[in-house]
Amino acid sequence: MSLSTLKPLLEVQGLTRYFGGLLAVDQVSFAVQDQEIFGLIGPNGAGKTTLFNLITGLIPPSQGSLIYQNNSITQLKPYQIAEKGIARTFQNLRLFGNLSALENVVIARHIHNQANLISGVLGLPKAVKIEQENYQKARQLLDIFGLAERAEQKARNFAYGDQRRLEIARALALEPKLLLLDEPAAGMNPSEKKELSDLIRKIREQFQLTVILIEHHVPLVMGLCDRIAVLDFGKLIALGEPEMVRNNPAVIEAYLGDE
């Protein structure tokens, strides 16, 4: 995908985060283009998930700023950032295991449409219509992810790879502009990883999404991403197209040499 005609959606500017005396993220700067698939790789403990937590407002930066659609989101709370169109998945699955796949996605629709929480209690006609739309859109998302026939099954009974797909479907129910995926291929077999890669491309096109993903499976990242940033000990050591990153001596020494 050509990036020459795209505009930056997210700008990370000198982002820094200390935990006590530990410098977890060290003056990291990069821009992510609209509808780009952007990879974030590096050794364990490099600061990747911390960076996601900073972008989504789960923790505040010690220094630096975050610009999303030309507006600062640096001091916003997580729910405010979500309202602006940023959604994420987590390294550790956070599904509601006792609820069905459909219910998991519908809950996210409720969060997206806060009016439903209020008017639904009152039984207003508008609320009934909104709820019907919530279920319709949830079923559409499950269909996209190949889970429609199991919509009524409890999430805890899904295989791990299917739970990963369900979590992404739930994130999409928030109708984000920017989707952050934290190790989406973890625990998947090679066939499932290939399906996931194809699926990410599909939802990028279908929903005009921008995607940032953390992933340890290097072939998936290299084959999927438009550009890749590499972190090591909290520092950005490389940024560029996959082939450039693959051949970067600093990246080979810090990370790819272990593959």
Which residue stretches match the model-derived regions?
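Glycine-rich phosphate-binding loops of nucleotide-dependent enzymes
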Residues: 2-259
